[in-house]
Swiss-Prot record:
The gene is infC. One of its GO terms (cellular component) is cytosol. The lineage of its organism: Bacteria, Pseudomonadati, Pseudomonadota, Gammaproteobacteria, Lysobacterales. It comes from Xylella fastidiosa (strain Temecula1 / ATCC 700964). Belongs to the IF-3 family. This is Translation initiation factor IF-3. IF-3 binds to the 30S ribosomal subunit and shifts the equilibrium between 70S ribosomes and their 50S and 30S subunits in favor of the free subunits, thus enhancing the availability of 30S subunits on which protein synthesis initiation begins. InterPro entries: T_IF-3_C_sf (IPR036788), T_IF-3_N_sf (IPR036787), Translation_initiation_fac3_CS (IPR019813), Translation_initiation_fac_3 (IPR001288), Translation_initiation_fac_3_C (IPR019815), Translation_initiation_fac_3_N (IPR019814). GO terms for molecular function: ribosome binding; translation initiation factor activity.
Length: 180
């Protein structure tokens, strides 16, 4: 039968040796070869003869599947796989960029470049357009700024939330478009 898949989906702790309480188990040898259905005592004696542990790897099967292996090494490999999987997942951050309705062209271009970089890295960007003093009476300038940002970013972004007014600032959220 060759290699077997070891699943520990619902069972955090694998039972080993004398913790296994079922009378008959399906045994896989230390070399990965299927040995067959044996009594628990026979399987334990076989594991002890090889100086290894009998580990229950599929308790929900009928009869449960056990493998003769080094339990310490097995746990170490499991931990290593879990750490690798954890490393590969990227936490999405929310970056925030602040604009004003009268943001100068040079500053606008720099912020736009930074925004594109954040989006390429897979982060979401929260855009704040702050109004000061009498600028509140010219909210259309903020809407124009938001529309310009949306136009300049093009099709490589998803607008998660349209520009909305929160107190004295207009807030908009953009995220990178998923590449398929």
């Amino acid at each position: 039968m060759g290699d077997c898949n070891i699943s520990t989906s619902d069972n955090k702790q694998n039972r080993k040796n004398h913790e296994i309480r079922v009378p008959r188990v399906r045994v896989i040898g230390s070399d990965g070869e299927m040995i067959g259905v044996l009594s628990r005592d026979e399987a334990l004696a076989m594991a002890e003869k090889e100086g290894l542990d009998l580990v229950e790897i599929q308790p929900q099967a009928d009869p449960p599947v056990c493998k003769v292996m080094n339990f310490g090494k097995f746990k170490f490999e499991q931990q290593k796989k879990a750490n690798e999987a954890k490393k590969k997942t990227k936490q999405v951050e929310i970056k925030e960029l602040k604009f004003r309705p009268v943001t100068d062209e040079g500053d606008y271009q720099i912020k736009l470049r930074n925004m594109r970089r954040f989006l390429e890295e897979g982060d979401k960007v929260k855009i704040n357009i702050r109004f000061r003093g009498r600028e509140m009476s010219h909210q259309e300038l903020g809407r124009q700024m938001a529309a310009r940002i949306e136009m300049d970013l093009g099709d490589d972004v998803v607008i998660e939330s349209r520009p909305r007014l929160e107190g004295r600032q207009m807030v908009m959220m953009v995220a990178p478009r998923k590449k398929s």
